[in-house]
Amino acid sequence: MWLSSVDSTQEELLRLISSLQQVNIVVVADKQEKGRGRVGRAWVTSPFKSIAMSLAYDVLPQEPTLVTFAAGVACSEVLSTRFSINVGLKWPNDLYVENKKLGGILAEVKHILGHYYLLLGIGLNVNQNANDFPSWIQEDATSLKILTKHSVNRKALVKLLVPKIDQYINSLNKTSPYRILDKWKQYSCTLGQHIIAKLPDNTYIEGVALDLDTQGALLIRELNGRITRLQAGDITIRHQALP
């Protein structure tokens, strides 16, 4: 379902599930007024130049925490192959190219009419020029047009992304769900990097991103040698060696 304008593709999908009681729906919008990312943050989209998309699943994976990893792998695989770019996955749910953000992923579990549904939101910068981004993110954001030097057909790209996302999400219940983490590591731009992590209590730690555990939590070796497990939070990658 391709719509001209919505408040949020996640909210529109939620309304459709509630009214139609079916989940074989993909919502894409040319314009999204109130897109959101993780922990309620606003997600900035450029009308008619972005992909703002939400998909629903009525079977929860064995490990719901791995959903964003599966979707990240799917998007990276499609974009890397189609556009010959090196897409990196930044923990936990961002798509990066050349140290700039190309897109992000949001997974939410909602209880609707006595049933649990997984809602997956994808935001992707497609046909923006640098000056289309707000000034405060211009240095940190990129788009497929900037990277490839040509405009991209958004509808054709959605047709490539949706089946690949379905494939990887559904695979979480068909094979060992932890295989997706091995795939994620192949695209990771996080592991081995010097990072600063903001913890849920608003404190910070600094160190090296070592690995993921079986639930997708990030293992960090702090400067004092201690290993810390980060299950939720934000990280900043510092592109320089540790002392």
Task: List PLM regions with ranges.
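N-terminal lobe of the biotin/lipoate ligase/transferase fold
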Residues: 1-81, 85, 103, 227-228, ...
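Long, positively charged amphipathic alpha-helical accessory segments at protein N-termini or as interdomain linkers
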Residues: 61-62, 69-87, 97-243
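Conserved active-site carboxylates
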Residues: 94
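A generic fold-level signal
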Residues: 21-22, 48, 90, 114, ...
